[in-house]
Amino acid sequence: MNKTITSIVAALFLMTTVYAQNTKEMATIYDFKALNNKGEEVDMAQYKGKVLMIVNTASKCGFTPQYDGLEALYKKYQDQGLVILGFPCDQFKHQEPGTDEEIAEFCRLNHGVTFPLMKKIDVFGENAHPIFKYLTQQVPTEEVHGLKDKATMKLVDGLSKSEGREEGGVRWNFTKFLISKDGSVIKRFAPVAKPEEIEADIEAMLK
């Protein structure tokens, strides 16, 4: 009987935890957890005091070369407190079809990626990961400058909406969210924003 009661209590606790991760009331990014590409749980609270960049990635996208720029930023600022987390996603025209193991190997061999890669997830829709629901609620829009970039994002908008992306949702692969040392979501960068264009913001937040 005691074992049964214990099991019921544990199940209720798990359901409560899952529900909590899907609410809007989460105070900061540190209230969330995610799985890395090895299936291990990662508590975002471990990044308190760090500048955090969260990026949804893909291996077969026109923006995939941005892996190089992201890795360059990581190597340059890692010791100063920058953490980059890559969340692979296959929702945009199936541009990330591989397994987590295949994705990790691709990133290592082709782009020398050493920053942490997470388990492949959805970033919009019913099954969107709670972290991305939270991020897009905090910063639902991004600035795009220049006629060429605006034209690119207009095209991307149409494509992502055809995939079922909701208003305010992540518009394409390599959308970047920059989070301050206290867990505040400070800025959202469009896929067209190259990693090196974000460097000044990172430097300012690391001070």
PLM region descriptions:
Residues 21-45:
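N-terminal "domain-start" segment that seeds a small globular fold
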Residues 187-206:
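Non-catalytic, surface beta->alpha helical segment in thiol-disulfide oxidoreductase systems
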Residues 7-17:
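Bacterial N-terminal signal peptides
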Residues 112-192:
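Thiol/selenol-based redox catalytic cores and closely related redox-interacting motifs
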Residues 50-51, 59-60, 64-88, 107-111:
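Conserved helix-turn-beta segment immediately C-terminal to the redox Cys motif
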